[in-house]
């Protein structure tokens, strides 16, 4: 298992709230919690920035992390990430914050310690461009949105 440096910024982690962990051996994401001081109501259409109480330093340029929404929050409550996805570069060392957007028509209350997002580590390839006049032909070619059909 890859070792990643994690800094605890909120002293409630490890006492009141657990360190981020994988729920099962097959889990891809670690749950991130709302480390707020008191419950926070997110009004319909509002976006808020919520601290997670941690920072990570990935260090390995072949890795990055992404902050992704939790499916239940979006499907059941209309709570999604304000920036749709958060990208954490390997050299970033600051606090992990979660932008929550209430896309529903009802207020939603985030409780202290609620699991609000998940953190997934992903491989990174930095590309070097090769300038060409033409691409090698493929069956798809320039076919874009909807090109491959519905069924």
UniProtKB/Swiss-Prot annotation:
GO BP, sorted A to Z: dUMP biosynthetic process; dUTP catabolic process
Cofactor: Mg(2+)
Gene Ontology molecular function: any one: magnesium ion binding
Classification via InterPro entries: dUTPase, dUTPase-like, dUTPase-like_sf, dUTPase_trimeric
Pfam families named in the record: dUTPase
Pathway where this protein functions: Pyrimidine metabolism; dUMP biosynthesis; dUMP from dCTP (dUTP route): step 2/2
Enzyme Commission code(s) on record: 3.6.1.23
Metal-binding keyword on record: yes
Class of this enzyme: hydrolase
Matching Gene3D superfamilies: 2.70.40.10
Binding locations of substrate: 70-72, 83, 87-89, 97
Reactions it catalyzes: dUTP + H2O = dUMP + diphosphate + H(+)
Tagged with keyword Signal: no
UniProt KW keywords: Hydrolase, Magnesium, Metal-binding, Nucleotide metabolism
Superkingdom in the source lineage: Bacteria
Reported function: This enzyme is involved in nucleotide metabolism: it produces dUMP, the immediate precursor of thymidine nucleotides and it decreases the intracellular concentration of dUTP so that uracil cannot be incorporated into DNA.
Similarity comment: Belongs to the dUTPase family.
Name under which the protein is recorded: Deoxyuridine 5'-triphosphate nucleotidohydrolase
Organism of origin: Glaesserella parasuis serovar 5 (strain SH0165) (Haemophilus parasuis)
